[in-house]
Amino acid sequence: MSGSTTGCGGPCGACKFLRRKCVADCVFAPYFDSVEGTSHFTAVHKVFGASNASKLLMMIPASRRLDAVVTLTYEALARLRDPVYGCVGHIFALQHQVMNLQAELAYVQTQLSTLQGLPPPNSQNNSRTEAASSSNVPLISSVDSKDNMSSSSSHIPCMSQQQEQEQPKEAIEVPTESVDLSTFFGLENPVDEDGDLNALAREFFTKYLTGGKYRPSSLI
């Protein structure tokens, strides 16, 4: 959308589309050139009509006609792409995009405020290590106490065993010589008439009391 006529004196884009001679005071010549102006004016003509667009531009001051031509062209192209909504569909799409961006921005701001409220990672690590060390102290003391108790309890039986070993055992003396069997069995009056009882007592003493070491003397 540039000056009225081309340098060669050809018609503007609007007059080229309308197949008419472009006059000096053509209202479309300053805004529709002969290259791209033809396609733009085609859209304006299909949507608004050439006569209606000409009347509208004549009613607007010359300082604001460029904005009006840009608006008419944008609306005409949008109506050709979307005959129902036109440029309103573009407005709805942009509003929806703005709402999505605002929601995303609010989410990011919430996450940022949450992260700013948290302490730095170094302080968190220090607090965790301090808590772990403080929790390990009673465990170590309890383990030490258990070890001391177990060691003391293990020393007690050892000491008792040592004491038992140190105590002298009383030797059990077993007579190996000949014993007066009448006195051993509590007989006040030994049997002299029959020597069988005395021999039986010697045999019993030899087997069960002296472990077979006792040798009975020969009978008289």
Curated annotation (Swiss-Prot):
Question: Where is it made, tissue-wise?
Answer: Expressed in roots, stems and flowers.
Residue numbers spanned by region Disordered: 117-172
Composition bias, kind Polar residues: at what positions? 123-139
Q: Which InterPro entries match?
A: LOB
Q: Where are the transmembrane segments?
A: none
Residues in domain LOB?
A: 10-112
- Name the source's superkingdom: Eukaryota
Kindly give the PANTHER family that the UniProt entry links to this protein: LOB DOMAIN CONTAINING PROTEIN, LOB DOMAIN-CONTAINING PROTEIN 31
Q: Which family does the similarity line name?
A: Belongs to the LOB domain-containing protein family.
| Designated name of the protein | LOB domain-containing protein 31
Q: Which organism is it from?
A: Arabidopsis thaliana
Q: Lineage, please?
A: Eukaryota, Viridiplantae, Streptophyta, Embryophyta, Tracheophyta
